Amino acid sequence: MLKVEMLSTGDEVLHGQIVDTNAAWLADFFFHQGLPLSRRNTVGDNLDDLVTILRERSQHADVLIVNGGLGPTSDDLSALAAATAKGKGLVLHEAWLKEMERYFHERGRVMAPSNRKQAELPASAEFINNPVGTACGFAVQLNRCLMFFTPGVPSEFKVMVEHEILPRLRERFSLPQPPVCLRLTTFGRSESDLAQSLDTLQLPPGVTMGYRSSMPIIELKLTGPASEQQAMEKLWLDVKRVAGQSVIFEGTEGLPAQISRELQNRQFSLTLSEQFTGGLLALQLSRAGAPLLACEVVPSQEETLAQTAHWITERRANHFAGLALAVSGFENEHLNFALATPDGTFALRVRFSTTRYSLAIRQEVCAMMALNMLRRWLNGQDIASEHGWIEVVESMTLSV
């Protein structure tokens, strides 16, 4: 199997001052192309360290994706490190220099002298175009390893990987068939509870079951070779059966996006009233393009379940909305949810059975509970669902 590695560069990445989202994205993207990463390394802005690790990995990896260090400043050292590792000098790429000058001219700016550095590449390097920025990429062969050097800006990095690097890999290597990966996301059951129920299932050869916990959800993932796809799809039916009503969506699209599409398909507008969640519902749904008619965040106040239900019923009528959803304030470990629909208003009062989670996590959980309540109504299910540490203590329905 092709041995593919990644090297992230930069003091800010090494010291944890920024999250290395490029590494996470590349690992996931390459995995789904049949190119799982075998190793990831991070090195700061130090020329000797960069040269050392380039020479070291050139003896072990078939492909190395180097990210960052192609900018115009003194701490951008990737091109010089590559040239030094090969025992070569840097040469000016005249065509890219002219492209950069055009880039700045079209934007009414004068290119700074320091940008000239971005057109200096190791001698004999293969130029890689950057259609969305000033940092071109390049490729060099060092010992057994084909190395690709890419910009650190995420939008530029992703374009270069997808449109420049992956096609080159497909031309030069015989790539394996991408694996099959089936995913679903659950809400309300613990990871250990799910694992206890699912670990009894017999997996086909080469197939693995994975769990990823990210409060307030747990993702289940069945991964295996394409040759086992039929067996995996049959097993997937058992996985969904065992996970039961805790399943909130399949795939990677996310619950807000799926709710947004369902609202649009059924021509429902939605109005929101939030206290404890502080606008989190509005943020998630607006980012997914949901048909939001009106959103408000109001100061937290103690309310009975009946008060919350009547308030959101009136709000739906006043805004001529298809649906209206409310999350009350959080008082004495209790919280109200209410959903006003054409069929009536459905409300729940819940109690948190633990206090060990932070405010941010509790808000995320409550936002997910509200979204799940909406999802269940749209699917024709009862709005209440089980949750490991949240208990429904009261429910009510207001008829139309």
From Swiss-Prot:
Coiled coil: none annotated. It holds the Pfam family MoCF_biosynth. SMART domains: MoCF_biosynth. Belongs to the CinA family. The lineage of its organism: Bacteria, Pseudomonadati, Pseudomonadota, Gammaproteobacteria, Enterobacterales. Signal peptide: none annotated. This is CinA-like protein.
